[in-house]
Amino acid sequence: VNTLTHHVNTLAEHILAQDSDRYLVGIAGAPGSGKSTLATELSRRLNAQGRKTAIVPMDGFHLDNAILDARGLRPRKGAPETFDAPGFLRMIHALKSGDEVFAPTFDRTRDIAIAGAVAVPAAARVVIVEGNYLMFDEAPWSALAKLWDVSVRVDVPMPELRARLIQRWLSLNHSSAVATRRAEGNDIPNAQRVIDRALQCDFDLNGQPARNS
């Protein structure tokens, strides 16, 4: 069984044992750790088992580039202060209430957030939220910790994160030099900050692929 399948098995077993009308799963971790992949596979498994599940990415709460430019924050895009944290907190409270919620998402290719792109119906019994700062020991993000019914961290060693973050820029057709500069100038410091200020999670998972076994 590969690492991802093992993690999905573990989490799905735990979640399916809960009898709740609305169960919030917070998947935290550094950029490039594999949060989105885990969220997608876990959602697929839960839906296949008859537990209606939705995914909400924290990335939809990126502040627009025009606002970041006005505040001199564009070079730090992805750092905690470049997100609408109060808006994100309000949405998490709305999700906990069990109501239908429309959430934004982020288009990485166009580098823009898209409002109302994710519909979370009232019938969704599980909502998987994934993002860098879901279990993060800096205000106002630290207020999120008590809102998750279960918290999950995806842990990846820094050398692997570095390679993935450079590859992310390469996949957007940047040169090797630009990709490396962007990753090392911003993404990697953000990743280190996530690691340094991490709060204890209910599940701590190794996000490295299994070395062939």
What are these regions (language model features)?
Residues 38:
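Hydrophobic positions on the alpha1 helix immediately C-terminal to the Walker A/P-loop
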Residues 110-168:
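ATP-dependent NMP and nucleoside kinases share a basic, alpha-helical "lid"
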Residues 114-116, 141-142, 167-213:
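Small-molecule kinase domains that catalyze NTP-dependent phosphoryl transfer to phosphate-bearing small molecules
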Residues 44-54:
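Post-Walker A helix-loop "phosphate-sensing" segment adjacent to the P-loop in P-loop NTPases
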Residues 35:
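Conserved lysine of the Walker
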Residues 41:
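Active-site signature of alpha/beta-hydrolase-fold catalytic machinery across serine-
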Residues 54, 63-110:
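Conserved nucleotide-sensing/catalytic segment adjacent to the nucleotide-binding pocket
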Residues 1-26, 30:
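Extreme N-terminal, non-catalytic leader segments
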